[in-house]
């Protein structure tokens, strides 16, 4: 289904997944938004297009994000989830905190907030403690710290795995 959103058409799934011989059922229109807040990253992962990117600042606008979320709702499209990603979001943690603050307003507080992080920086740990997150994905591509350091192309401090004060039920 195409929905006119401020003069641009967005495609929104109209039916749920068909299970066996069951007929398809209509679903209410919804979207998940992926918000890349920066290309900058503290790691140099061999497999990542953002590996070691130095560009930290982003032309990202928090008021524009809030306006889009509200506008989609007004257009009858439910914003189910906002995924905050990067690069590494914690390299622009003040911006991410502004997003969380804006998404805590009554008209946006029903949107699921998700963080994707490598969790290696002290500010990553601080961001993960924020109560507005509904879920958090932490990229741990190996259980062995030495091998993980090789994959990430940087040394990993033991403090990176200090989850004190972080709601582990939100961590994936």
What are these regions (language model features)?
Residues 1-34, 54, 75-77:
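N-terminal [4Fe-4S]-dependent radical SAM core
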Residues 44, 77-78, 109, 132:
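Short loop/turn motifs at secondary-structure junctions
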Residues 31-35, 80-84, 113-115, 136-138:
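Hydrophobic faces of well-ordered beta-strands that scaffold small-molecule active sites
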Residues 51-59, 150-163:
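Short glycine-enriched, charge-decorated loop/helix-capping segments at active-site entrances
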Residues 21-64:
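Canonical Radical SAM [4Fe-4S] cluster-binding loop centered on the CxxxCxxC motif
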Residues 68-86:
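Short Fe-S-cluster ligation motifs
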Residues 54-68, 89-133, 140-146, 166-170:
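Canonical radical SAM enzyme core domain
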Residues 79-82, 134-135, 162-172:
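Conserved C-terminal portion of the radical SAM core fold
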């Amino acid at each position: 289904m195409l929905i006119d959103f401020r003069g641009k058409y967005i495609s929104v799934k109209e039916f749920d997944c068909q299970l066996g011989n069951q007929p398809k059922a209509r679903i209410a229109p919804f979207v998940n938004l992926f918000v890349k807040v920066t290309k900058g990253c503290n790691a140099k992962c061999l497999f990542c297009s953002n590996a070691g990117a130095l560009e930290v600042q982003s032309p990202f606008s928090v008021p524009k994000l809030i306006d889009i979320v509200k506008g989609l709702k007004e257009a009858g499209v439910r914003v189910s989830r906002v995924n905050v990603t990067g690069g590494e979001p914690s390299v622009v943690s003040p911006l991410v905190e502004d997003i969380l603050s804006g998404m805590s307003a009554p008209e946006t507080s029903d949107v699921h907030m998700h963080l994707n992080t490598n969790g290696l920086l002290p500010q990553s740990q601080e961001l993960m403690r924020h109560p507005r997150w509904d879920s958090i994905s932490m990229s741990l591509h190996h259980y062995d710290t030495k091998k993980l350091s090789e994959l990430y192309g940087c040394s990993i401090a033991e403090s990176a795995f200090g989850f004190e004060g972080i709601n582990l039920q939100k961590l994936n």
